[in-house]
Structures are given as structure tokens and as C-alpha cells.
């Protein structure tokens, strides 16, 4: 089953929280990070768990291999689009905000072309 945009965002959020040095990411941490309600996050996490993107043990959320792959792919897209926007003269903060919106819909082919364009 293909991952949906919101699912990508949850996986990326979990991934980034661990990258920031959190030892134990819980649902409440995800709620705070993306400003969503506990019920919304719980539903999304249940779906991600059912689809084998994450595991949850004693409240601790762990990304499984395919969850990590999705998070890294989305982050790579975000960084490529943001860098491209900056390269063509868009303000850094606007570049980040716009890239966050585009990262879920851009094709692999377009992302690869952007990465070549920016020299990565």
C-alpha cells in the first residue's frame, strides 16, 4: 500500500525528533511537534503501525526500516527543493516553508533533476 501525505509527515516528524537527540519519541512528542491533537496522532500512528512503518512498545515509537526509508526520502526531497529555491533567489525561510509543502507531491524524477541542478 502506498504511503499517504500525512503518513509521510508523521514518519518524518518521528525521524527528525530522533535526529534532534530524543531518546524516546512518544505520541505526545509528535502532537507537540506538529501541533495536532492526541486523537489525530493516535489514529495516524495506529495506521502506520498496521502498515508496518513503525512499532510502538511501552509508548515508545520506533521507525521500522521502511518507515526510515520513507522519512529519509521525504527529507531528501525537502532539502533538494529548499536548496533549489535558495539557489534561484528565494528567501531561506520561504524556501523551507514551500519545500515542506512540495516534498510530498514531487516525483522522484523531478527530485533527481533538482538534485543534479543544485549539484548533489
Where are the model-predicted features located?
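Residues within the alpha-helical elements of helix-turn-helix
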Residues: 33, 70, 87
Amino acid at each position: 500500500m502506498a504511503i499517504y501525505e500525512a503518513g509521510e509527515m508523521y514518519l518524518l516528524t518521528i525521524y527528525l525528533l530522533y535526529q534532534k537527540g530524543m531518546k524516546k519519541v512518544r505520541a505526545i512528542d509528535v502532537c507537540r511537534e506538529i501541533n495536532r491533537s492526541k486523537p489525530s496522532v493516535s489514529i495516524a500512528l495506529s495506521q502506520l503501525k498496521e502498515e508496518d512503518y513503525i512499532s510502538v512498545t511501552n509508548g515508545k515509537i520506533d521507525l521500522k526500516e521502511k518507515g526510515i526509508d520513507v522519512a529519509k526520502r521525504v527529507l531528501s526531497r525537502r532539502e533538494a527543493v529548499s536548496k533549489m529555491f535558495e539557489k534561484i533567489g528565494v528567501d531561506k525561510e520561504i524556501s523551507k516553508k514551500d519545500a515542506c509543502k512540495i516534498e510530498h507531491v514531487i516525483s522522484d524524477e523531478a527530485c533527481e533533476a533538482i538534485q543534479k541542478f543544485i549539484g548533489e
